[in-house]
Amino acid sequence: MTWNPDQYHQFKDARSAPARDLQALIPERPYAQVVDLGCGTGEQTAQLAQRFPQATVLGLDSSAAMLAKAGAQQLPNLRFEQGDIQELSGSFDLLYSNAALQWLPDHPRLLARLWEHLRPGGVLAVQVPANHDHASHRLLTATANEFETELGGFTRFGTAHGASPVLTPAAYAELLDGLGAVDITALSKVYPVVLPGAEGLIEWTKGTALVPYLSRLDGADAARFLDVYRGKLQAEFPGERVYYAFTRVLFVATRPEL
């Protein structure tokens, strides 16, 4: 996927609010090795490095464009690498991921794999969007189905209905309990966002949900895709003001000491 950091940061304040809440849930401990999975442009990674100066903090992301921006974050205990979350190696005292794991399938299996990289006494802290039932996502999947040939049958989650892998807070809590976690917190929170009509929703989704689709289309097909999607949004949201219930799931858990 080809990420555009400037497009993503068009709504920086709104997108940053859940991250602040996630960081507030992280307990104060003498972490030695910290990793930010899907670190993007690195602002939150730098915040972790500043908060835990005794720790070596790694920001991991698959996007070269995002990491190019992250390079502006300069701290002695901070470094960035390009890589795949699913190929993570090493062990860590804090596994942190804000708005990244929703791109990966099969969260029960994913969390079990990540748990293996968490040291005894370590903390897992995750935030994922849970907006897959919102009209903007449903209409995006409907548009993708109309462009099945151009997209080679691709839908974001590999099914005709574009089903999200994101679970409920209760389901994450149960999964973590099954892994032996303690001090589990799992919650859902709505961050209200008001956007300027359907066009505002287009700009919002260009930063995230549209990326895997537009990355697979050439210029002409991408423009047609946007036009079809825009038409669906305008029919659903004909007014000049769209209230968007920006819903997030946050969970934090500790691996017991040996």
UniProtKB/Swiss-Prot annotation:
GO terms for biological process: methylation. Its EC number is 2.1.1.144. GO terms for molecular function: trans-aconitate 2-methyltransferase activity. Catalyzes the S-adenosylmethionine monomethyl esterification of trans-aconitate. Keywords: Cytoplasm, Methyltransferase, S-adenosyl-L-methionine, Transferase. The gene is tam. It is found in: Cytoplasm. This is Trans-aconitate 2-methyltransferase. CDD domains: AdoMet_MTases. It is an enzyme of class 2 (transferase). GO terms for cellular component: cytoplasm. It catalyses: trans-aconitate + S-adenosyl-L-methionine = (E)-3-(methoxycarbonyl)pent-2-enedioate + S-adenosyl-L-homocysteine. Belongs to the methyltransferase superfamily. Tam family. It holds the Pfam family Methyltransf_25.
